């Protein structure tokens, strides 16, 4: 899955 600007 592509990375988003939000951290998990």
From Swiss-Prot:
Asked if the keyword Membrane belongs to this entry, the reply reads: no
E.C. number, please? Answer: 1.7.3.3
Residues of the active site: 7 (charge relay system)
> What is stated about pH in the biophysicochemical properties?
Optimum pH is 9.0.
Q: Which reaction does it catalyse?
A: urate + O2 + H2O = 5-hydroxyisourate + H2O2
Which pathway does it take part in?
Answer: Purine metabolism; urate degradation; (S)-allantoin from urate: step 1/3
The family classification in the record reads: Belongs to the uricase family.
Quaternary structure and partners: Heterotetramer.
Protein's UniProt name? Uricase
Question: What is this organism's lineage?
Answer: Eukaryota, Fungi, Dikarya, Basidiomycota, Pucciniomycotina
């Amino acid at each position: 899955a592509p990375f988003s600007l939000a951290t998990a």
